[in-house]
């Protein structure tokens, strides 16, 4: 911890332990990766737009799927850069107030429930062979990374406690220490969520229409559960 390499390494390990725990960002990463494995247009595979089995994902779809995790981490990381700066400027104590944690939980929980509801509504029409001509619009992974991070009150609390402590230690080495801390932390997210997307891409041949809908449904259930839990925790913090 007395060198920039030590700070980066320990920051990576602590960040990885947190990233590996189930949460909204993991759920969105799985859902977005699966969605991006769908062929952009079934006509490219020689079938009609409504053909339920136009063929396996092509190289472009595999690449899009593999990039889902890194793009979500990009959105997550952009938000964390802003938060690191804010914490350094004194926002840490504000984030520990019950009223702030409470409102983050209530609003964040509502956002997660809304995202889950949208996933539930889309289940009936989901298909790996869906054509781009249907005009389906999806949330960009970078935006999804930002929204899911903002919706999690425990993310803000982590930065106001563990993150604040790490920042204080890092600043003993000046700007270099702070940069080392952030790089180690964000690389842990990139390593884990990138690995999740890559594993889904490598196993894409097992992703049938039925399995895809089941995966999206499971993600929606988890998001809905997280939303209710965050909302409940937020209300408890507000009435405490």
Regions found by a protein language model. Give the residues of each.
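Alpha-helical transmembrane segments and their lipid-water interface positions
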Residues: 25-26, 79-90, 112-116, 155-156, ...
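Juxtamembrane transmembrane-helix termini in multi-pass membrane transport proteins
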Residues: 2-102, 162-180
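Flexible interhelical linker loops that connect adjacent transmembrane helices
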Residues: 125-144, 205
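Hydrophobic/aromatic residues within the transmembrane alpha-helices of Major Facilitator Superfamily
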Residues: 12, 16, 20, 117, ...
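Selective transmembrane alpha-helices of multi-pass membrane proteins
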Residues: 97-127, 185-196, 207-240
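Selected transmembrane alpha-helices and immediately adjacent juxtamembrane segments
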Residues: 20, 139-161
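Helical-face signature of the major facilitator-like transporter fold
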Residues: 11, 15, 19, 141, ...
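Alpha-helical transmembrane segments and their membrane-interface junctions
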Residues: 158-170, 230-238
